[in-house]
């Protein structure tokens, strides 16, 4: 039912576009002779806002964010593939695909950026207090999706004001958002696969019943440690480069608009919160003495299938 709200907004946006320009083909919309007509500015604004409303429902952005943690009930392998690499990214891709329309509406760009930043912060605050390992990763996914929307909104606003403020690097936000989308697909899939290995071994998702698994599952603990470093933005890891680009693009906009200055501080705080709750996840799962549940249930074999994803979170110099 929650995603149906987004579906309604998406449908309204498509209706407005078709009623205004008579087509829904990207190639025809982006080259339509009336696209820059001032009389159509209001229609473009409402159409892009409604399309973003569809993305909010699909990519679990505030206030339609609460469905995603409940949708993580399937196997972690499914969550790694669908919920982190493909399905929930559809909203982000939709906004990126309709970018030539969004840059024509600075109001929509600001709304996208604010929604993304607020979502990133709210979801991170929830992840900090969760004890279910899969729910921590689920709220982390929502938070990182918010980062992507923040970057896309920032880039669109910069593109509109490029002539006024000389923002020649207005594409930085757009590229940073898509770069983070690709990075997140890999390191979050790694984290979910590692979490699945842990759950399969101890038969519980409650991190309070875990602990000390580093000794009995050294490969899984190392692989998840690499994923934690990447999502936390540790220097030279893939997540560091994309998060740095996002923060830089928001900071540059903040020099000309106070709203983006506030969003930069919020995004920076969220980055610190991300490092905290992901470190908390690893420490509660792998460090300290073994709990009774671990001593009783863990098997003396490691799950090496997560290793194949580890190298994807290592330094990605060729992409920079």
Language-model-detected regions and their locations in the chain:
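...captures the hydrophobic TM-helix bundle architecture rather than a specific catalytic motif
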Residues: 1-312, 318
């Amino acid at each position: 039912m929650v995603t149906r709200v987004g579906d309604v907004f998406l449908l309204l946006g498509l209706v407005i576009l078709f009623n205004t320009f008579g087509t829904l083909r990207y190639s025809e919309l982006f080259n339509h002779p009336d696209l820059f007509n001032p009389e159509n500015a209001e229609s473009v604004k409402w159409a892009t806002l409604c399309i973003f409303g569809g993305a909010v429902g699909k990519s679990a952005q505030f206030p339609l964010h609460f469905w995603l943690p409940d949708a993580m009930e399937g196997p972690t392998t499914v969550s790694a593939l669908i919920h982190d690499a493909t399905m929930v990214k559809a909203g982000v891709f939709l906004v990126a695909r309709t970018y030539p329309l969004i840059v024509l509406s600075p109001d929509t760009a600001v709304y996208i950026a604010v929604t993304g930043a607020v979502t990133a912060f709210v979801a991170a605050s929830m992840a900090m207090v969760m004890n279910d390992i899969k729910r921590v990763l689920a709220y982390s996914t929502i938070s990182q999706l918010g980062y992507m929307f923040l970057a896309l909104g920032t880039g669109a606003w910069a593109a509109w004001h490029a002539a006024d403020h000389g923002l020649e690097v207005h594409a930085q936000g757009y590229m940073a958002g898509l770069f983070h989308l690709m990075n997140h697909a890999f390191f979050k899939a790694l984290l979910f696969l590692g979490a699945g290995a842990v759950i399969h071994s101890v038969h519980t998702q409650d991190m309070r019943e875990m602990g000390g698994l580093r000794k009995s599952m050294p490969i899984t603990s190392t692989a998840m440690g690499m994923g934690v470093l990447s999502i936390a933005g540790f220097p030279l890891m893939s997540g560091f480069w994309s998060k740095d680009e996002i923060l830089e693009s928001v900071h540059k906009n903040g020099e000309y608009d106070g709203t983006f200055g506030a969003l930069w501080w919020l995004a920076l705080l969220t980055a610190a919160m991300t490092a905290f709750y992901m470190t908390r996840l690893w420490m509660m799962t792998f460090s300290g003495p073994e709990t009774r549940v671990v001593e009783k249930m863990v098997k003396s074999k490691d799950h090496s299938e997560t290793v194949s994803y580890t190298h994807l979170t290592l330094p990605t110099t060729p992409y920079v």
